[in-house]
């Protein structure tokens, strides 16, 4: 039996990964992390979606220690979430240092226990918010270290790494879940479900990708099929 663990936040990217994983694996587990994030609603959204989509199990892990160590606008109410600035340089204050290091490592430990061969994460390097822990080289390096440390080949999969947001929408649509991803996921840094606040960086990426996809569905769908090998 093929098993996978999805690092699951209930946002657009991880939900699209879950939708695809359910088609590719016999048994899919979801792991969501409670790190004292600014908007706890994402945990509730993740619970609802994991149940609705048919994950074998959904585990919410308490990692609130991360909140004490990592100062970010996503962990501190006193730090405002910035509006999207297309020309902004550097790492944004929404970056939570060490988050993906911790999440992927703990997900791998869980995968070890349930005998899963893969940990799936929705990180992307094509159009992202400048987070260093979303890069392909980081994921591969951590995957190598974790596999060595466990003496087990647990594979980190990043199905969205080299596709853009328009193609991520196309992937959801390919599996018949575009409306669900649009209306029932929570990606917004200000904690607003669906289309979100419309002015944070996460909402801007999401909306621009959706508009691009809806404006030229055939071209974008053809591109995602070519990149992923979907028929």
From Swiss-Prot:
<comment type="pathway">
    <text>Purine metabolism; 7-cyano-7-deazaguanine biosynthesis.</text>
</comment>
<feature type="binding site">
    <location>
        <position position="197"/>
    </location>
    <ligand>
        <name>Zn(2+)</name>
    </ligand>
</feature>
<keyword id="KW-0862">Zinc</keyword>
<keyword id="KW-0436">Ligase</keyword>
<keyword id="KW-0067">ATP-binding</keyword>
<dbReference type="InterPro" id="IPR018317">
    <property type="entry name" value="QueC"/>
</dbReference>
<protein>
    <recommendedName>
        <fullName>7-cyano-7-deazaguanine synthase</fullName>
        <ecNumber>6.3.4.20</ecNumber>
    </recommendedName>
</protein>
<dbReference type="GO" id="GO:0016879">
    <property type="term" value="F:ligase activity, forming carbon-nitrogen bonds"/>
</dbReference>
<dbReference type="InterPro" id="IPR014729">
    <property type="entry name" value="Rossmann-like_a/b/a_fold"/>
</dbReference>
<feature type="binding site">
    <location>
        <position position="188"/>
    </location>
    <ligand>
        <name>Zn(2+)</name>
    </ligand>
</feature>
<dbReference type="Pfam" id="PF06508">
    <property type="entry name" value="QueC"/>
</dbReference>
<feature type="binding site">
    <location>
        <begin position="8"/>
        <end position="18"/>
    </location>
    <ligand>
        <name>ATP</name>
    </ligand>
</feature>
<feature type="binding site">
    <location>
        <position position="203"/>
    </location>
    <ligand>
        <name>Zn(2+)</name>
    </ligand>
</feature>
<keyword id="KW-0479">Metal-binding</keyword>
<keyword id="KW-0547">Nucleotide-binding</keyword>
<feature type="binding site">
    <location>
        <position position="200"/>
    </location>
    <ligand>
        <name>Zn(2+)</name>
    </ligand>
</feature>
<comment type="similarity">
    <text>Belongs to the QueC family.</text>
</comment>
<comment type="function">
    <text>Catalyzes the ATP-dependent conversion of 7-carboxy-7-deazaguanine (CDG) to 7-cyano-7-deazaguanine (preQ(0)).</text>
</comment>
<keyword id="KW-0671">Queuosine biosynthesis</keyword>
<dbReference type="GO" id="GO:0005524">
    <property type="term" value="F:ATP binding"/>
</dbReference>
<dbReference type="GO" id="GO:0008616">
    <property type="term" value="P:queuosine biosynthetic process"/>
</dbReference>
<dbReference type="GO" id="GO:0008270">
    <property type="term" value="F:zinc ion binding"/>
</dbReference>
């Amino acid at each position: 039996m093929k098993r996978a663990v999805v690092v699951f936040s209930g946002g657009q990217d991880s939900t699209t990964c879950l939708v695809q994983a359910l088609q590719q694996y016999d048994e899919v587990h979801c792991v969501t992390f409670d790190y004292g994030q600014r908007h706890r609603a994402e945990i509730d959204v993740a619970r609802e979606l994991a149940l609705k989509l048919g994950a074998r199990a959904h585990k919410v892990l308490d990692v609130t220690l991360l909140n004490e160590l990592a100062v970010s606008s996503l962990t501190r109410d006193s730090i405002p979430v910035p509006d999207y600035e297309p020309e902004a340089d550097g790492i944004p204050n929404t970056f939570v240092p060490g988050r993906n290091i911790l999440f992927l490592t703990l997900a791998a430990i869980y995968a070890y226990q349930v005998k899963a061969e893969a940990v799936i994460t929705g990180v992307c390097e094509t159009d992202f918010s400048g987070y260093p822990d979303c890069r392909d080289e980081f994921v591969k390096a951590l995957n190598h270290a974790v596999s060595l440390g466990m003496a087990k080949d647990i594979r980190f999969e990043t199905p969205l790494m080299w596709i853009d947001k328009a193609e991520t929408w196309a992937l959801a649509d390919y599996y018949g879940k575009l409306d669900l991803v649009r209306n029932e996921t929570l990606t917004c840094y200000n904690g607003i479900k669906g289309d979100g606040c419309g002015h944070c960086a996460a909402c801007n990426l999401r909306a621009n990708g959706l508009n691009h996809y809806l404006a030229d569905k055939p071209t974008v769908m053809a591109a995602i099929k070519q990149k992923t090998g979907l028929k």
